[in-house]
């Protein structure tokens, strides 16, 4: 985790904290020590894209769609949530990296299932029954699926107004709605049902919002034009019920 998440993030953050000095170093200005520091920060930050090794052909070309598919370390939350991918792409001024991230973010907002496992873009994340997988086919509804999709949406938010702007397609919308609807079945009056993620057996007597509350707010705040008027009404009703920790959605329940 340190080699691909924490240390590269620290390196890229340090780089941008001293951006003027880094620009000088890359422009051939400054002393040898500054240039070496800049090179080292860029080398370490790139580990967000290179580590851990997959021991396949993608290790030779990390800026590839196949790098972000069919491996537990490179899909869902482990792909997009904990790695400083976009900052590193900006650090390297890499158009191919940003091209790739825009595509991965959009295609990652999708569903998988037992029957589509080999063909789905990601082998984990949202599942067709409205639940979710993480670290393979483990039932981790409230962790990796939300983390991966939330950060995909956040990156797409940042790319709005740029040449890399993407709209949510109907497949994206259907995957999101399916998860919002399905996830509500695993939550009751402020409490997550047991056996659904890594922390669901921890005793907590306090009511908490459903874990996808932040993602729902993001959709309503930034992506409402991707939904039909009827879907927008459904999302707004869900948001009101989420705020009360009482999700019934009686108008929409089967």
Kindly give the residue locations of the regions a language model identified.
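Extracellular polysaccharide-recognition and catalytic grooves
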Residues: 2-20, 26-254
């Amino acid at each position: 985790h340190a080699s691909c998440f924490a240390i590269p993030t620290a390196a890229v953050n340090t780089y941008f904290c001293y951006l003027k000095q880094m620009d000088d170093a890359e422009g051939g200005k400054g002393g040898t020590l500054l240039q070496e520091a800049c090179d080292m920060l860029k080398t370490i930050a790139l580990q967000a894209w290179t580590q851990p090794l997959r021991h396949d052909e993608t290790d030779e070309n990390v800026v590839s769609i196949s790098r972000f598919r069919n491996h537990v370390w490179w899909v869902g939350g482990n792909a997009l949530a904990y790695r400083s991918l976009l900052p590193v792409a900006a650090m390297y001024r890499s158009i191919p990296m940003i091209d790739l991230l825009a595509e991965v973010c959009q295609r990652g907002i999708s569903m998988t299932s037992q029957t589509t496992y080999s063909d789905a873009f990601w082998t984990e994340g949202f599942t067709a029954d409205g639940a979710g997988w993480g670290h393979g086919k483990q039932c981790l509804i409230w962790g990796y699926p939300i983390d991966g999709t939330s950060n995909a949406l956040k990156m797409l938010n940042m790319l709005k107004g740029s040449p890399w702007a993407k709209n949510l397609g109907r497949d994206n919308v259907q995957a999101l709605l399916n998860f919002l609807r399905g996830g509500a079945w695993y939550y009751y009056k402020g409490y997550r049902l047991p056996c659904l993620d890594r922390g669901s057996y921890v005793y907590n007597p306090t009511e908490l919002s459903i874990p996808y509350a932040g993602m729902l707010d993001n959709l309503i705040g930034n992506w409402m034009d991707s939904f039909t008027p009827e879907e927008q009404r459904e999302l707004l009703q869900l948001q009101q019920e989420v705020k009360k920790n009482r999700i019934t959605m009686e108008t929409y329940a089967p």
